[in-house]
Amino acid sequence: MDEFEMIKRNTSEIISEEELREVLKKDEKSAYIGFEPSGKIHLGHYLQIKKMIDLQNAGFDIIILLADLHAYLNQKGELDEIRKIGDYNKKVFEAMGLKAKYVYGSEFQLDKDYTLNVYRLALKTTLKRARRSMELIAREDENPKVAEVIYPIMQVNDIHYLGVDVAVGGMEQRKIHMLARELLPKKVVCIHNPVLTGLDGEGKMSSSKGNFIAVDDSPEEIRAKIKKAYCPAGVVEGNPIMEIAKYFLEYPLTIKRPEKFGGDLTVNSYEELESLFKNKELHPMDLKNAVAEELIKILEPIRKRL
């Protein structure tokens, strides 16, 4: 697998693929992703970090923006508390094997020049466009705050300030990234990853909703959470267990089953697994048991490093 294919695998889209191929030719290139510091780093975060590791392996310098001011604007707590959580997040990302430069937003977002450029960008952005870009990110929908229109403009400015070639995020970041491509003099390549479905099957996996598997969960916690997770027979779309099987598990995969239910099953690819499950040749509980045990193995090195 070449560098381009390695970066492209398991992404939802790259804007644009041609521009990424040009960036890959550069001797020095950089990519960034921003995270609002979170009390629990879960599989949704891990999926993003896995992509940053792909970029790292393709020769990119990696920048992780610990977006403390963004978290503050999104009503995630007081700044001191958010900063402490960010310090913990850094340790978790390092335990995942990522080698990166870590930057707190508050280290540069309060500078005079940064603030002045936010004002310049604000003059070019309609209120409707700024609000629309926050639809999948904002914490509160019914009574939106002015902070919600400052947030995306700051994120656009972050891309400019950091001077990166590639911006990475989940699909919920797409509208902000498109705004950046329109407003900034340098068109950044945008890599968008899937947004994992929460274990309850309702919306995205989120620490605030409690519908997640944390990367430092114990084996017992992982088994219990997966056992209770939404996983209707034959349904692939919006099935969190199938998503975990697609984005985290390695193949061939052995699914252990009692002899009376057909005995152990070897699955050579995710596509084969999807076909078996869709055709109801694989029971949800057998799938859950296999996914739980494989996930425990995958997360064990991270737990040990922490």
UniProtKB/Swiss-Prot annotation:
The gene is tyrS. It comes from Methanocaldococcus jannaschii (strain ATCC 43067 / DSM 2661 / JAL-1 / JCM 10045 / NBRC 100440). Changing residue 286 to R: Decreases the rate of aminoacylation with wild-type tRNA and increases aminoacylation with amber suppressor tRNA 8-fold. Decreases affinity for wild-type tRNA and increases affinity for amber suppressor tRNA. It is found in: Cytoplasm. GO terms for biological process: tyrosyl-tRNA aminoacylation. A motif ('KMSKS' region) lies at residues 204-208. PROSITE patterns: AA_TRNA_LIGASE_I. NCBIfam families: PRK08560.1, tyrS. One of its GO terms (cellular component) is cytoplasm. Residues 228-231, 283-288 are annotated as: Interaction with t-RNA. Its main location: cytoplasm. InterPro entries: aa-tRNA-synth_I_CS, aa-tRNA-synth_Ic, Rossmann-like_a/b/a_fold, Tyr-tRNA-ligase, Tyr-tRNA-ligase_3, Tyr-tRNA-ligase_arc/euk-type, Tyr-tRNA_synthase. Coiled coil: none annotated. ATP binds at residue 207. SUPFAM superfamilies: Nucleotidylyl transferase. This is Tyrosine--tRNA ligase. It catalyses: tRNA(Tyr) + L-tyrosine + ATP = L-tyrosyl-tRNA(Tyr) + AMP + diphosphate + H(+). Its EC number is 6.1.1.1. L-tyrosine binds at residues 32, 36, 173. Changing residue 107 to T: Confers specificity for the non-natural amino acid O-methyl-tyrosine. Catalyzes the attachment of tyrosine to tRNA(Tyr) in a two-step reaction: tyrosine is first activated by ATP to form Tyr-AMP and then transferred to the acceptor end of tRNA(Tyr). Homodimer.
